[in-house]
Amino acid sequence: MTISPPESGEKNKKVLEDPVKADPRPIDFAKLDKPGFWSSKLSKGPKTTTWIWNLHADAHDFDVHTGDAEEATRKIFSAHFGHLAVIFIWMSAAFFHGARFSNYSGWLADPTHVKPGAQQVWAIVGQEMLNADLGANYNGIQISSGIFHMWRAWGITNESELMALAIGAVVMAALMLHAGIFHYHKAAPKMEWFQDIESMLNHHIAGLVGLGSLAWAGHCIHIGAPTAALLDAIDAGSPLVINGKEIATIADMPMPHQLCDPQIIGQIFPGLASGTGNFFSLNWLAFSDFLTFKGGLNPVTGSLWMTDVSHHHLAFGVIAIIGGHMYRTNYGIGHSMKEILDSQQGDPILFPAPKGHQGLFEFMAESRHAQLSVNLAMLGSISILVSHHMYAMPPYPYIATDYMTVLGLFTHHMWIGGLFIVGAGAHAGIAMVRDYDPAKHIDNVLDRILKARDALISHLNWVCMWLGFHSFGLYIHNDTMRALGRPQDMFSDSAIQLQPIFAQWVQSIQASAVGTFLLAGTSEALPHKALSEVFNGSLVEVGGKVAIAPIPLGTADLMIHHIHAFQIHVTVLILLKGVLYARSSRLIPDKASLGFRFPCDGPGRGGTCQVSSWDHVFLALFWMYNCLSIVIFHFSWKMQSDVWGLTGGNFAQSSITINGWLRDFLWAQASQVLTSYGQSISMYGLMFLGAHFIWAFSLMFLFSGRGYWQELFESIVWAHNKLKVAPTIQPRALSITQGRAVGVTHFLVGGIATTWAFFHARLFGLG
């Protein structure tokens, strides 16, 4: 079993006096020639095929590489720079494709008719048919990342600017790689620096988030918003005039650096040319032309107003800079996280914990897995919130009418959120096994939760059963009634209604707030446009397509939402059980000594397999996948039916039966991917079949046991020996845990890629 290594380093010195250690570890390229160099066992090389799997399992498990927590933390810190380098290279590739292989200029000139493309297929074996006619004399593969819409919002108007960004991103990647090497080999931070929580919060909140948002606000104000104003005027057919010249095309537009000239910018936003005097005299109304609170969507682009976005980033940046300074660092004032936590007591009636939150600060500060768990849970939740905001409040010009991009980005952010939340459960389990010391948590809230785990899990189990039987039961009832020809006895908007009254109430109070509530600090009533149109608003149309419209809710939504609730609760049940029972259970009291992942509790103990914390993560991944599949199916059909007008509003009556989901969603909408051969979307037909194969391949790992394969290998090795071609590396069947890992990976990749092909072919096929 692996336990996180103990801390090292001096505790008494002030952190800022000596925060780094110089030349702690020389650069040694010889290690790169020896896979598994961190382990004496792995570094000897493979004797059996199990070696390669152990290499993969432990490559990033820094706890097993070193006996020093400081060293492990430095590796994590250094790896962050490597991660940033990969991100910059990825961004550079996107910019380069936009600069070299895309129709960005053509799309920018006519975004309602030209489709975005940034890749052209070479005619090697006849696959050039994948290059569709996307308009503007461009043939290529249509993309759905939303990157063109984002570039337009940034204020990028030509391919030269994209090439400059591509070069800049490569330079940044090189700097990040250098920083990763430098801060591990040349000037590595000490443990005290990593443990200086208040200083970290100060720099992350005020520095990274606050100053980052403020800097982006500066770009939006000086480049993004003026460029958007000029482009919007061109698209609306009423171009602006600058210095007596009509800006009728993109070629007529001023260069980005010219937009910083007060004489030019003053003709677009007079407030921007008014100087800083108004700022220091608090006459901020002078800036209300470029820092707005219009609300709603720009009718030309179907997206949020760029001046509203500028205002948002400015306000958020200021709030974060102020908020980042509320922690006690150098001057003895402000909050101490330890004092805050240690002073919090448990509720004396509902949750008696005599020692309250004592010990939690140390646990969170010292356990990297506990920190990662909380961060993953929060970031995953934020990703899911982002996915919902992107269609309700479209941030980028013309993105709302690019339906494939809207659906793709919703799906993308939902998957990210789900994977991160499962990751939160995984690292919480590792933290409990490796970092949790029961002696330091006697009678605090964490200890009390662990003592109440049986009540928590049994009640959560009851909730899952209740939700599952009732929500699924509604569908079974409806299928039965429809099969028997009794529509009057079904749960539907036209028979026995189950209206989502609470959700409808939330929608109505949003809408009723218009004109009645006053904006803070003013006598102005809340304007209608301050709300998303999905809350009983009005339809916004761009280029003859619906950008956003009110989203009505009815019986069908209540039914599927209770399926969502059921699946979310089961996923949480599995993850929470894996965390609360990570160290011990009635079945295996000494589970902590077995580690985070183990197949069974040794020979002679039947019925103790698949109980490790790792196995709970394994099971939760399946439930997360099932849960999010229904969520993205619901979103796809609901938007096509009730907002975009593509399926004749059939969601309310068809989705209330299981047969309706199979017939009118899966089967009917799969027609595009199944009939894609011979068209430019034929790759999605191939992907649909290939991804099904990958998914089916996973079942081989999930259904059959280790012994079956080992028995088969023995026979195959015997045949090789007979032919005198015996392998030097002895074949070994995958362990139980390895088989499950390979199985769930192929299950998820196959399922996600199948959905990807299904969604893309559907909406690309409809044009």
From Swiss-Prot:
Recorded topology in the membrane: Multi-pass membrane protein
Location in or out of the cell: Cellular thylakoid membrane
Residues holding divinylchlorophyll a': H692
Region feature (Disordered): 1-22
Cellular component terms per the entry's GO annotation: photosystem I; plasma membrane-derived thylakoid membrane
EC number per UniProt: 1.97.1.12
Binding-site list for phylloquinone: W709
Keyword field: 4Fe-4S, Chlorophyll, Chromophore, Electron transport, Iron, Iron-sulfur, Magnesium, Membrane, Metal-binding, Oxidoreductase, Photosynthesis, Photosystem I, Thylakoid, Transmembrane, Transmembrane helix, Transport
Subunit structure, interactors included: The PsaA/B heterodimer binds the P700 divinyl chlorophyll special pair and subsequent electron acceptors. PSI consists of a core antenna complex that captures photons, and an electron transfer chain that converts photonic excitation into a charge separation. The cyanobacterial PSI reaction center is composed of one copy each of PsaA,B,C,D,E,F,I,J,K,L,M and X, and forms trimeric complexes.
Stated name of the protein: Photosystem I P700 chlorophyll a apoprotein A1
Taxonomic source organism: Prochlorococcus marinus (strain AS9601)
